[in-house]
């Protein structure tokens, strides 16, 4: 059942998933049960009337920065990481299509026999036609993370909200896994994140979001139904925005 768009707090969103989110309890690769569950969450949100774009990291398959630290050429490593994100995008496309929805994968690097090139106007048209759109290969440039790619694409498509899915239910003043007295923030401004040196996403990605006044919500993707609840305005996780923003 599709609900009226007016019932949603956010109509067009970009969801950033880490590659590790696809692994489940495994040490490498993609757990079919996990990716199918995540696909179900995305479909549920789409059925509520949302326009959904996704960016998926590649860390479950390859981390270019890690091997660069051990001597591999950084540019080569980052290009390999981009290919890993395409693998994950195709896997998610397959999982979503098996649930009966239309999906497009758009890559920042040319791989035309596999997926479309990223063209901004075409991406927006896909979203307007209720096609879930997955952006792969980051920004297409080395030295930029998939967080930066997610922030950039969210701005380009005019997203109402950038969602960063993690295994922690928000932003804390210190690591909640190490400190039992860690305090969770419900809302933060961009300046507060910077002044408190809180780790939200990499600096380039955060600067893009801040400069474009793009609201960012950090949340735990492992909670069932959480994506739909956020789209309907529930205060889940931590929202980062300018203090004068109404989002």
Swiss-Prot record:
It comes from the Bacteria. Pfam families: AA_kinase. ATP binds at residues 16-19, 59, 63, 166, 172, 175. SUPFAM superfamilies: Carbamate kinase-like. Keywords: ATP-binding, Cytoplasm, Kinase, Nucleotide-binding, Pyrimidine biosynthesis, Transferase. The keyword ATP-binding applies. Its EC number is 2.7.4.22. GO terms for biological process: 'de novo' CTP biosynthetic process; UDP biosynthetic process. It catalyses: UMP + ATP = UDP + ADP. The keyword Ligase does not apply. GO terms for cellular component: cytosol. It is found in: Cytoplasm. Its main location: cytoplasm. Inhibited by UTP. One of its GO terms (molecular function) is UMP kinase activity. UMP binds at residues 58, 78, 139-146. Pathway: Pyrimidine metabolism; CTP biosynthesis via de novo pathway; UDP from UMP (UMPK route): step 1/1. HAMAP family: PyrH_B. Catalyzes the reversible phosphorylation of UMP to UDP. Homohexamer. PANTHER family: URIDYLATE KINASE (PTHR42833), URIDYLATE KINASE PUMPKIN, CHLOROPLASTIC (PTHR42833:SF4). Belongs to the UMP kinase family. This is Uridylate kinase. It comes from Xylella fastidiosa (strain 9a5c). The gene is pyrH.
